[in-house]
Amino acid sequence: LFIDRSGIPLAFCIHPGNTNEQTTLIPLEEQILRDFSLSKFIVCTDAGLSSERNRKFNNFGGRCFITTQSIKKLKKDLRQWCLEPTGWHLKDSLDTYDISRLEDTAKNRSRLFYKQLYVEGNDGKRDIDFDQTLIVTYSLKYRNYQQQIRNQQISRAMKAIDTEPKRIDKHSQNDYRRFIKKTSITADGECAANKIYEIDQDAVQEEAQYDGFYAVYTNLDDDPSEIAAVNQGRWEIEESFRIMKSEFEARPVYLKRDDRIKAHF
């Protein structure tokens, strides 16, 4: 779904549920270029659409991008730079901050700390520069929110260990059961007759280190805090999908032919 800055839908395309969404962005952009005769626009996407191929496509022809970047998937040196507690900034301030020393106060919870790193690159296919800025933000409010969600998931995981052991082994990437560790051997290395389930504290700590952090790649030269604010506006797309599923009752779809599925939406 493409929307403008006011949240008004511009274009919508439908794909089978098993389609890799990264491959859907460029064809839809090309359609918008034809239909709306747009010469310039800024594409703002979540991490699911943030492939290097898509970013390079939006690095020429008057197009720009702001795309979410998973910190976990960055190279080790960039990941360490993102999580480094020193060298953070605030909008309209010349000071630098150490986020490890922040007190959890109302004032600090309302602040958005950031830092940026210029990353040089090249688009060999088009023989042009592919330079990006990696912008990382840190928010105590976002950190507390992520901690709250994870604590709720850990509580569900503990309950599952006690009541639903047969369902523990099957889980998705963000499922609460990812925090459950299974042991099938004894301390002596022998096969155990029963599986032992417990909370995986290593997995909890690994995930907790990213609490409060958020990263984007962009080829814009604007103020980092302004770019972060634009990216946060993506919630309007999620809101549009919620409206379709609730008020518009767009799902479930009891149709099979592609033309009728499109007509339904």
Go through the PLM ranges and name each one:
Residues 1-265:
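Anion-binding and metal-coordination hotspots
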